[in-house]
UniProtKB/Swiss-Prot annotation:
Its cofactor is FMN; NADPH; Mg(2+). It is found in: Cytoplasm. Gene3D superfamilies: Aldolase class I (3.20.20.70). Involved in the biosynthesis of isoprenoids. Catalyzes the 1,3-allylic rearrangement of the homoallylic substrate isopentenyl (IPP) to its allylic isomer, dimethylallyl diphosphate (DMAPP). GO terms for cellular component: cytoplasm. The keyword Cytoplasm applies. CDD domains: IDI-2_FMN (cd02811). GO terms for biological process: isoprenoid biosynthetic process. It catalyses: isopentenyl diphosphate = dimethylallyl diphosphate. This is Isopentenyl-diphosphate delta-isomerase. It comes from Streptococcus pneumoniae serotype 2 (strain D39 / NCTC 7466). The gene is fni. Homooctamer. Dimer of tetramers. FMN binds at residues 60-62, 90, 117, 179, 204, 209, 253-255, 274-275. Belongs to the IPP isomerase type 2 family.
Amino acid sequence: MTTNRKDEHILYALEQKSSYNSFDEVELIHSSLPLYNLDEIDLSTEFAGRKWDFPFYINAMTGGSNKGREINQKLAQVAETCGILFVTGSYSAALKNPTDDSFSVKSSHPNLLLGTNIGLDKPVELGLQTVEEMNPVLLQVHVNVMQELLMPEGERKFRSWQSHLADYSKQIPVPIVLKEVGFGMDAKTIERAYEFGVRTVDLSGRGGTSFAYIENRRSGQRDYLNQWGQSTMQALLNAQEWKDKVELLVSGGVRNPLDMIKCLVFGAKAVGLSRTVLELVETYTVEEVIGIVQGWKADLRLIMCSLNCATIADLQKVDYLLYGKLKEANDQMKKA
């Protein structure tokens, strides 16, 4: 069942097309008089207890099937060569099946910056086992209540999640990242997570892979919930009051370096890409994908140079305009 479900997730994630992307409603104000040389632009950032050379990473996607193994190996090769973080999909499948080697990428990619992922429905003992077996630099702990509710075989008991989060925050020996799965983390959840000791969250908003769409596609029901949740930029706007207390990572519908820059302008420490990279490794050779990802680094630098920003922190000083739904929602928040 798990193997089939994981492969269905890949299939439906690739076929899904979103009609709305919140990044298109943000316009950055260009600077006509440059201050820096291109070679002065610094892409480094810090989150989860360490410094990273680049402000983007390959986010959690898959594992638990032969197809997942193939994809994870490709993604690991891209990430290792490009010097970026790669986070595997949920390790739960391997916890259920010790012979599952679809997550075993470190042996063939020893210099890989590896993260892994587990659901908050799992008690901390399984989180500790995951860290012991995978030896990641960080552990994503995902919250996916709507996905679980839409899955016929999904979780129905959620009272333990908050106590689990407190346990993860206290007992996991590597930094943890509380991660949404495409529904947009709300500010109240960030506040509760902060109270439990969490200092890094991935907002993961609507606009990219929709697990509501995927589960409804699997079941043939409830397509009226396909657009559930807050868009990525809306979730980031909602989280502005927390950006000085909690490290905000952003994912969900990120397509290119300009989308990444827009996240960084609003205080993100780094940006995760899932479906965009999945489409690349399913379309091109690994060598070609590496070339594309290396090109993203160059593009980030040239966009930052045109905005008069030498560092990631400088981007928060960039002026911008909001349009459409984002502007309407932002105006409402200012009145509240």
